[in-house]
Amino acid sequence: MSTTVGQVIRCKAAVAWEAGKPLVMEEVDVAPPQKMEVRLKILYTSLCHTDVYFWEAKGQNPVFPRILGHEAAGIVESVGEGVTELGPGDHVLPVFTGECKDCAHCKSEESNMCSLLRINTDRGVMINDGQSRFSINGKPIYHFVGTSTFSEYTVVHVGCVAKINPLAPLDKVCVLSCGISTGLGATLNVAKPTKGSSVAIFGLGAVGLAAAEGARIAGASRIIGVDLNASRFEQAKKFGVTEFVNPKDYSKPVQEVIAEMTDGGVDRSVECTGHIDAMISAFECVHDGWGVAVLVGVPHKEAVFKTHPMNLLNERTLKGTFFGNYKPRSDIPSVVEKYMNKELELEKFITHTLPFAEINKAFDLMLKGEGLRCIITMED
């Protein structure tokens, strides 16, 4: 590895040249890391709905050509000036949001929304100098959420890199750098269900099932899965879900159905769909006096949350969360340890594996709604 330090590395990357078109495998030049940056060799990456959303570019600013990808694991190849806590050979997870450790958010025990490195989906360059580290024939290829893991090598700000246990299998723990931690933390860190409590999970995709896994780990006795797709129910049992509600089966609002099932409402709910009606239902289905609802899904930009103020005055709590309230550098290593201690099971989230050359198949699988996480192996 050391022979490449300070040099431009030419490697393979899957480039999104335009919205909705298949990614193209290209030879890209990856510049050395600058001040407070790290160059990583990506070994495994997985596909998340966020990658597909920005590849389709239907509802936001299109930034192309771009190297997508943000859920991954790899090894540090080299570090830039000022980087002291990471070195070549370290095993790491790059994360789409960061932790500078200096701002008010990073110094707060309550927040993980770093002022410097908070996710910015429009920015396609490094914050240090406003330039891209990727190029083809001298022309820049843009970054994605500071990670761009659909490349054999990438450059990331040090604050967006979590150093993890070198014994952790990178082909499993790579899924912890985004969706699984988001759902898990929403339950464990924000909803905080107690042993024996009831929890409703709205949306049984990968993030929702991770939220259910959090409820299972916390010792919840009833985990009610809510989804319009009945085919997801069987799989959800593996994640601790005990009961299922399909809103299509009822003529009344799902919050009323859940209230009747649970003698007045669940103790906690976690909403993972981003649909505004589900968000309102998730809040209104929690028990008065102590119920807590946590919103995880990202709504449409025109969405408006409407509920009667009495629902709040009757001592229900509504919370939002970002990345499960985990600080990337400080907290994600301990989530990896949950897996290493067999407290958290990751294998059941991984339903497909593909070589890097077949990355477009991973997009097809997600667009068809097949499986949960597809691991893409970077090395042949």
Curated annotation (Swiss-Prot):
Regions that span the bilayer: none
Ligand binding (Zn(2+) 1): 48, 50, 70, 178
Binding site for an alcohol: 50, 70
Cofactor(s) essential for the protein: Zn(2+)
Major localization listed first in the record, in broad terms: cytoplasm
This protein's UniProt keywords: Cytoplasm, Metal-binding, NAD, Oxidoreductase, Zinc
KW Metal-binding (keyword) present: yes
CC cofactor note: Binds 2 Zn(2+) ions per subunit.
Record's note on what induces expression: By fungal elicitor.
GO biological process per UniProt: alkaloid metabolic process; formaldehyde catabolic process
Binding site for Zn(2+) 2: 100, 103, 106, 114
Reaction(s) catalysed by this chain's protein: a primary alcohol + NAD(+) = an aldehyde + NADH + H(+); a secondary alcohol + NAD(+) = a ketone + NADH + H(+)
Record's protein name: Alcohol dehydrogenase 1
Source organism: Solanum tuberosum
